[in-house]
Amino acid sequence: MQRKIVLVNQHSGYLFLDVVNAFAKEYDQVVLMAGKVVTMDDPLDPKVTVQKIFPYNRASTFKRFMSWIVCVVNIWWLLLTKYRQHDLLLSSNPPVASTLIPLLFRRRTSLLLYDVYPDGLVATGFVGVKNPIFKVWAWFNKCAYRKVDRIITLTDGMATTIQQYCPKEKITVVPAWSNVPTVEHSATKEENPFVEAYGLQNKWIVMYSGNFGKGYHLEPLVKVAENFRGYPDIVFILVGEGWQKELLSSRIESHGLSNCKILPYQPSAFFLHSLQACHVGVVSLTESLENVAIPSKTYNLLAVGHPIFCIGSVTSALARFLEKHEVGMTCDPTDTESMTRFIERLYVDKEYYRRLSDNALIVAKSHTKHRARDILELVAAGAQNRP
């Protein structure tokens, strides 16, 4: 009997594509339903069929929700008419798919939850726990999660949140992983295309790369840059786009900070080079992620041997992770004095920097693409155990 599976992710990045490729090695037919596929160095296995679905639209809250709803209808119709005999692995993108689709079909279904909804709406202040949207969505979760074979998530905090909807025996934690090879921190410093493109030769680089959205604590990083005016070789680089860009640019300009630069998102060919170029990687946590998620960029920074500087809650899942493995430090967004001391210590104390860097490489070796294989095995086992 042929094994067929449909994997669904409205906006598929490297973590999900690694999972898809793992299934392609074992299953007879593999279909990826995605509105957008973002590949890095590893292309999709040619065996995989890509089925386009309605793309994610983050232009506004209304458009975001509408793109979720339209996408779920799109998925439902395709499963009803074109992929009637396939097992399912549904991600939480779009969020309503992992709640509604299991209720609409009787077939082997597993969930891969990167986010937990409706709890994420509460964390961002969009609704309260007494709001009818929260109550109805939570009730549907309990009905849907009762029907699925396996729920896979990324952190213990997320697993704890999911337990309100189903027995903990159904839930397995598989941590995220890096998309880059584990390499020594200084492996390509001398002739790095990213360094050459932006004139960063002989600079000691503190870098944030990602979303400049409202919930990210990036202004404190610019404030810290002000404290390093007397260090001509230390620079602060912010790579990305988003709502805060104009605010950050204005502060940099008004304070005459020649040691702080904003760069646009880099082409994929520069991704690994930009990671290797910096000396300290910055991660900012939004309040909605503090207790449930560890951003995937964390693992990429570890893979190139960088100490990590987190701006966010000192009691977050990431803060505990950094402290446990001694690979970095978390500072409250208001504590720019501690931020300054930490960066200065990394710069001055070479032995301390090397210890954190070596620890990062050790941790990275346990967070590689073999985790995608773990997800494959969990889904396959769940399918075999279903009567």
Question: What is the predicted function of each stretch?
Answer:
Residues Y14, V70-I75, L80, D87-G120:
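An aromatic- and histidine-rich active-site surface loop
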